[in-house]
Amino acid sequence: MSTGGDFGNPLRKFKLVFLGEQSVGKTSLITRFMYDSFDNTYQATIGIDFLSKTMYLEDRTVRLQLWDTAGQERFRSLIPSYIRDSTVAVVVYDITNVNSFQQTTKWIDDVRTERGSDVIIMLVGNKTDLADKRQVSIEEGERKAKELNVMFIETSAKAGYNVKQLFRRVAAALPGMESTQDRSREDMIDIKLEKPQEQPVSEGGCSC
């Protein structure tokens, strides 16, 4: 029933939440995808940021709602509510920081606690431009993804490497989630309009 009528329906919306430790490049990946740019000045995300982009696929057009979460411990209590109605969780680590890689297991566990198996999870090893400082091999990333039954890709937000491919692969996986999306579409529209009151810090509403 959900096939065939796509073009007559309002634009389908899918919520992607970006998770991972501080400074792994979550904001940079979103900025590269949204604006094809990279800011060398690091600025920590304060609370939760939200951006939206229309993506044109071969068979339909979708709107991706990109939720950028803070990696700092003090904001962790906010994150489960954003995971709860997500269609996709993008869990990012820094290939030059083995601890950020080890912590992805916890982030993926958090996603599954909130969403069960009813979610697409993409594990992303970012900062391949710093290959000389690599602490996590691509084989280790692939192995963890296989063990945890998630998708995997390596990227460089700085160089633009594989960023479009990351979103293409996520988009290609979306049709299997249509029933979930239909069920949560109204909630997602409400959330989009809220711009969460949970943001605890008044300054720094934008940390792109």
Curated annotation (Swiss-Prot):
A lipid is attached at residues 206, 208 (S-geranylgeranyl cysteine). This is Ras-related protein Rab-6A. Interacts with BICDL1; leads to its accumulation in the pericentrosomal region. Interacts with SCYL1BP1. Interacts with VSP52. Interacts with RABGAP1. Interacts with GCC2 (via its GRIP domain). Interacts with RAB6IP1 (via its RUN 1 domain). Interacts with TMF1. Interacts with CIMAP3. Interacts (GTP-bound) with APBA1/MINT1 isoform 2, also called Mint1_826, but not with isoform 1. Interacts with RIC1; the interaction is direct with a preference for RAB6A-GDP. Interacts with RGP1; the interaction is direct with a preference for RAB6A-GDP. The keyword DNA damage does not apply. Regulated by guanine nucleotide exchange factors (GEFs) which promote the exchange of bound GDP for free GTP. Regulated by GTPase activating proteins (GAPs) which increase the GTP hydrolysis activity. Inhibited by GDP dissociation inhibitors (GDIs). Pfam families: Ras. It is found in: Golgi apparatus membrane; Cytoplasmic vesicle, Secretory vesicle, Acrosome membrane. Prenylated. The modification O-AMP-tyrosine is found at residue 82. GTP binds at residues 23-28, 39-40, 42, 45, 71, 126-127, 129, 156-158. It comes from Homo sapiens. Its EC number is 3.6.5.2. Belongs to the small GTPase superfamily. Rab family. It is an enzyme of class 3 (hydrolase). It catalyses: GTP + H2O = GDP + phosphate + H(+).
